[in-house]
Amino acid sequence: MVLRNPGTKGIASALDERSGEIFRRIVESYLESGEPLGSRNLSRLLPVSLSPASVRNVMSDLEDLGLIYSPHVSAGRLPTQLGLRFFVDAFMQVGNLSPEERASIERQVHPGNRDRSVENLLTEASQMLSGMSRGAGLVITTKSDPVLKHVEFIRLAPTKALAVLVGEHDQVENRIIELPAGITSAQLTEAANFVNAHLAGQTIPELRTQLEKVKETVRGELDALSQDLVERGLAIWSGSEGDGQPARLIVRGRANLLEGLEGTDDIERLRMLFDDLEKKDSLIEILNLAESGPGVRIFIGSENKLFSLSGSSLIVAPYRDSDDRIVGAVGVIGPTRLNYSRIVPMVDYTAQLMSRLSR
């Protein structure tokens, strides 16, 4: 389910059972409270009796390994980024979703929900991940090639129309297009009827290829303005007027990231994260991260160059279509003290359901 990072394997050999237990307690305390854990409180948590002085000696060794640090003099210890990565790889036990959690995810993301619009499904999936994780939920989808079931052109203004494409699973995609000057409502209907009669049952790229093959038929059945309208509709649906990048990123739960902020440094890091999420390059990067290995990927702090300055963690998994092509990704972004063991199965199950929905 989770792709581990091989870079921390060597650290495990440097820890004995006692050191490992102390390290684990420090990290778990940080993930729960965000506060440093001191030697006196730590000694009370251990299953075996160990004096605070002995605990401090072990903590010193863990600091030498780069796994923990002291935020200021005479404070307790917090895990470093390396420490968090090592904890995730060596100590984290991925939990199981409860029946209630699985049911909650299925209510939002389920193959039986095909009658809802793609936009609504993506938004609800993102909102659901946010609510269950207390981080920011994200869903990315690439431009897909739905099989056409029905087309309609609806005039909005003298020079604009809504081009409506209904896919084979009744998913609806709407685009506003510029109309050829002088086109009539009757010509809008003729253009839609031509597409439905000659081109239904194909994907948009196939439609454009087929249109070239039936140009003689087009000339015989449609006038020049209607031909122009058909070509404009296919062009905007296929994304030829864009740059071919992922179609949309939906992020919900940004307010969750405001909780627990302390001082201007935290606020500035959050601002940088929000700025990163608005950049189109970020969509490509997140998809590339999801594609870089099977299963759920976990990126902590600067391991993910996209969010390295904001000090955020990303848990992400791809979802696939019927041809096993990656067509999007789902995930959670939040502070480095995310509840990784709980969020990983949540993201994994959501990605599985999104894959079923995409088939």
From Swiss-Prot:
Keyword Glycosyltransferase part of the UniProt annotation: no
Xref: Gene3D superfamilies: 3.30.450.40, Heat-inducible transcription repressor hrca homolog, domain 3, Winged helix-like DNA-binding domain superfamily/Winged helix DNA-binding domain
Keyword line: Repressor, Stress response, Transcription, Transcription regulation
GO molecular function: DNA binding
InterPro entries, sorted: GAF-like_dom_sf, HrcA, HrcA_C, WH-like_DNA-bd_sf, WH_DNA-bd_sf, WHTH_transcript_rep_HrcA_IDD
One Pfam assignment: HrcA
One BP annotation, GO: negative regulation of DNA-templated transcription
Similarity comment: family membership: Belongs to the HrcA family.
Role noted for this protein: Negative regulator of class I heat shock genes (grpE-dnaK-dnaJ and groELS operons). Prevents heat-shock induction of these operons.
Protein name listed in UniProt: Heat-inducible transcription repressor HrcA
Natural source organism: Rhizobium meliloti (strain 1021)
Gene: hrcA
